[in-house]
Amino acid sequence: MTMFNWQQKGWPRATCNRAALRDELAAFKVAFMELKKALKKPQDMEVVARALTDEAVKTSAIEGVNVDESVVMSSICKALGVEYAPKGFTKDARAEGVAQMMLAVREKWNAPLTAKLLTGFHGALMAGEEKRVAVGAFRTHKEPIRVIRRHADGTAEIRYEAPPSENVPKEIAAFARMWKAPATTPADVALKCAMIHPHFESIHPFEDGNGRVGRALVAKTLAEGLDMPLVLPVSTVIARHRAAYYEEINEASRSLDWTNWAAFFIPVLTEMMTSFVAAMRFVKAKRDYLAKYESGFSERARKVVLRMFEDGEEGAKGVLSAAKWMRMAKVSKPTAIGDLQTLEKLGAIVRVGDGIRLEYGLSGFTVEPINEPLNGELDERLLKLAKTHPGVQLSYMKSVVGKSLATVKRAIAALVKSGLIEHRGSKKTGGYYVKEVR
């Protein structure tokens, strides 16, 4: 019979092989320090509101709960004093609840970890759900809490069974004692984030909402490490790796060695921080551009340019043609050409390319580049394998480098993106090669 981690000798003290995580911790440190440097400037409340909203929406989506993003954003912006004009208005109690939890996490970012803090987060999250679950209170029912996977053939598999409800107060007391001390170095922050999450999920102290509260604790741990009230959108990246996230956390629930889990989760945090710094720099570049040119825009031009910014950096760096302007502004071709010529005279757009079609780009729009964290020795070993074993497959790479599949996949993806290696052949039988320079 499978023994879950809380049933094993040594619980609740899980272990993590720090030496085996050298590459992951090094990459985390680069991203963490880059983020800390970016945050030395006054916080842009638009970025803060966007991060809180993204985290609220994605942490809900991971659990299969869809919330209205505009309701979340409106609630958060109102609390932060940020201007926001929602496209419509709907009532969504779950959206309001998760928004209030995010605001509570931001407010209590450096508060001591206590049972009261946890039940407070849960109370905000589940407000209005009193008929369904115990809100703001740990579970007390005698029935076991189980995570069950149902298969296509109708059979069911118990993936996890949490400690009995009667054990929860004792488990939470031990949890709070273990994690009350703040992490002081980037490596300690990474490891605390990686360890606190499966520990909390293994206790599963609430009837519902454990995943959302658990991910909020990761955001709180990062805020403590950064020493500022900032809730980072951890769940936006977890959502991209949702299947692997559930698989890895399920493995952690059956063992007290959480090295493989940490090897998966720390790069997720690294990816999130890198994306967040990019978002901060994009907002600054957008603000700088609009401050320089917006006063000369017509209302129509303003709407089109802002629409380009809605698609992020990729949208802002896209090209404008008369045909595209016609679609976006819903005007005739002569009007579109006239609008573009006016913006060109203003200096807001410049001609790009040398093709037959006349195309423009936003003038001087640049986003400060990011120092992408690398995996150091791991990158070198994977590159060497692709060179000495042309067509090498992922499974062989994993066995040679001795890292988790998630870590190897992420490193390979970065090498492919950088143009150093490429995949050839089918998904099942193809392999990786050093990319030829043409």
Where are these regions (language model features)?
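FIC/Doc superfamily catalytic core
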Residues: 1-438
